[in-house]
Amino acid sequence: MANSIVSLAGDQVLAVAQADATKVYRDLSTYRIQLALEEDGWHVDYELKDPRLKGGGPHYIIDAQTVAIISKRYEQ
């Protein structure tokens, strides 16, 4: 049961991050998404799939209880 709660929360967190990231980056298909639950909340990191490309994607910390964005940083 605890695993499905974390899974559900992970899906919600990803939806929040993706909604914000799409506004800024539009096309997210060139990014690999990393999602990890840490002590300070969910960390969602968009990293370029192609290591030869310069720049990067958005990075979020999202509250594990409220699913609100605590911090975000954009790389271009």
Model-derived regions, located:
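Exposed beta-strand-loop-beta-strand "reactive/processing" segments of non-cytosolic proteins
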Residues: 29-69, 73-75
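Short, non-transmembrane alpha-helical segments in secretory-pathway proteins
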Residues: 1-32
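Short, solvent-exposed mixed-charge patches
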Residues: 1, 75-76
